[in-house]
């Protein structure tokens, strides 16, 4: 009889224990969510105190090097006009010395001056003795000035002429392949066509535009 009473009382006690535990867990969760909510409100209030477009000071927002100050456009224009005037005076009086140029020809860039020889590892469809004009001029310069192209100088500003003086072949190059104990041996002789040009003149316009 006593055992039956104890067995009947056990489910009720267990149910009360479960309800008490669930209430304590819910209460703890409620306090935690409330604390998180209050913390988020404090963070939002602190972030709202910064001005709009605020960027924290870091190595990216504030680089360690000095800020580049661009020149005044009016002053730059005046200085450019003075330089052009001085270069025009040097060209008009012929007091610029020996001219040199950088030309682009046959997929290469060549720094040349008058009476220079350039060897081109290619065959050109030009006969010996013919005179050609090198139109792709990247820059031309003298002792006191240099004119740079962006990327090329205008054709009416500078003129570089050359003459084909020789068309020949390169010295034979032997390419030998050998594998030991494989009875493999391969020999190849490479001969490339060559063209030699002589730079005749480098002329510049009498006045810069």
Curated annotation (Swiss-Prot):
It comes from the Eukaryota. One of its GO terms (cellular component) is mitochondrial large ribosomal subunit. One of its GO terms (molecular function) is structural constituent of ribosome. The keyword Ribonucleoprotein applies. GO terms for biological process: mitochondrial translation. The keyword Lipid biosynthesis does not apply. InterPro entries: bL21-like, bL21-like_sf, Ribosomal_bL21. Residues 1-43 form a transit peptide. Pfam families: Ribosomal_L21p. Keywords: Mitochondrion, Ribonucleoprotein, Ribosomal protein, Transit peptide. Signal peptide: none annotated. It is found in: Mitochondrion. NCBIfam families: L21. Belongs to the bacterial ribosomal protein bL21 family. This is Large ribosomal subunit protein bL21m. The lineage of its organism: Eukaryota, Metazoa, Chordata, Craniata, Vertebrata. The gene is Mrpl21.
